[in-house]
Regions:
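Alpha-helical transmembrane segments of multi-pass membrane proteins
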Residues: 139-144, 220-227, 262-266, 362-366
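Hard-cation-handling environments
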Residues: 201-260
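Hydrophobic alpha-helical membrane-insertion segments
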Residues: 135-139, 211-226, 290, 305-315
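Hydrophobic transmembrane alpha-helices and their helix-loop junctions in integral membrane proteins
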Residues: 1-203, 216-218, 224
Length: 367
């Protein structure tokens, strides 16, 4: 959001930095989507999905081309990327909030975050099921829902920036549809979990389901809001339009990804995580471990920064910086002791010091 607010400054003074924003966002989107495909904790799936979707927004901002018309106004391609990123910020806030709240209702019902402790919940939680499905369809980019419009605009901006970037983000969008419906089928389809015998799941109270209904309703109609009339990089209205070829291609790919997830997971009795692990054991382990980014972070921070950077800096701070100020304090104390000796209450001593001082001033004046 800060990049979006400061976007005119980026375009004017650092347009080359937007290229870094584009490719860092593209790599982050793919990384987070890959990790989400292997997680079994529903909150982690949604968390990495959020990382991926925020990366989508960053890519859109970076893909805003720094070109200007003769009047000095940003061209349509530049406005498209900016508008698409902010539009996706709005639509994503709606359906992702609904998904997280729905996950809270599910965890409240089964007392677990793991998909292995779920299954068949559509019979027990109909409202949560329908609202969750609507938001999964939206984030997957199914035509007509809010996520389709904003994500399609981002992909269009990416194709204007670079065909490679456009296809890359289309792949990430396909992965998004796949892992979201992997999550959906793992929670609401399949056979009932054995734990349901002792603790039967139930729908959340209306205080929890009412926000789901409101957010899913906004998700249904949010894409039809003329967002371009409110937000554009140049501060002028920008009419949203769909590139038919890109829209059809991205829609078909999203539906194929949903179909693949449906074929693999719908109605199956084997736990979701076990299927991926059995089919791609090594790749699944890498993705489940988040490609060992946590271990890399721990190594860099503890083995390198703390040992070879932080410790020398701490020694320098303790012995040099603190030592210098300790020396100043010691010197000031010693000087005060010496000066305090002059204040002995003897008038003769005061007169002597005054005379010596006056003599020194006289000598300085005549010399």
């Amino acid at each position: 959001f800060q990049i979006a607010r400061m976007f005119p400054m980026w375009m004017e003074f650092a347009p080359s930095a937007l290229s870094i924003v584009v490719w860092v966002g593209a790599i982050t989107a793919f990384y987070a989507a890959s990790v989400a495909c292997a997680q079994s904790d529903i909150k982690r799936v949604l968390a990495f999905s959020t990382i991926s979707q925020i990366a989508f927004m960053m890519v859109a901002l970076g893909a805003s081309l720094p070109a200007h018309s003769s009047e000095g106004i940003l061209d349509n391609h530049a406005q498209l990327g900016y508008m698409a990123g902010m539009f996706h910020l709005f639509t994503h806030a709606m359906f992702k909030a609904c998904l997280f709240l729905g996950a809270g209702c599910i965890i409240h019902a089964v007392h677990s975050n793991e998909m292995s402790a779920m299954g068949g919940l559509r019979k027990y939680m109909p409202i949560t099921h329908i609202t969750f499905l609507i938001c999964c369809l939206a984030i997957a980019g199914v035509p007509g829902l809010s996520g389709f419009f904003s994500k399609d605009e981002i992909i269009t901006a990416c194709f204007h920036y670079s065909p490679v970037l456009g296809w890359w983000m289309t792949l990430v969008a396909a992965m998004t549809a796949f892992y979201m419906f992997r999550l959906y089928y793992g929670i609401f389809w399949g056979k009932d979990n054995e734990a349901y015998v002792e603790h039967r799941p139930h729908e959340a109270p209306w205080t929890m389901t009412l926000p789901l209904i409101v957010l899913s309703a906004v998700t249904l109609v949010g894409g039809w809001i003329p967002f371009g009339h409110f937000v554009s990089a140049a501060g002028t209205a920008y009419d949203i339009h769909l590139d038919a070829q890109i829209a059809i291609t991205s829609s078909v790919i999203a539906l194929l990804s949903i179909g693949l997830a449906t074929y693999i997971y719908m109605g199956k009795t084997q736990p979701v995580a076990d299927k991926l692990e059995a089919t791609f054991p090594r790749l699944h382990r890498w993705a489940y471990k988040r490609f060992y980014m946590d271990e890399v972070y721990q190594f860099v921070t503890h083995r390198i920064i703390f040992r070879y950077i932080s410790r020398p800096i701490a020694w320098f701070d303790r012995h040099v910086i603190d030592g210098f100020f300790d020396f100043l304090a010691w010197g000031t104390q010693r000087l005060s002791l010496c000066i305090r000796g002059l204040q002995n209450g003897s008038v003769q001593a005061y007169a002597f010091v005054f005379a010596v001082g006056a003599l020194l001033v006289f000598l300085i004046m005549i010399l």
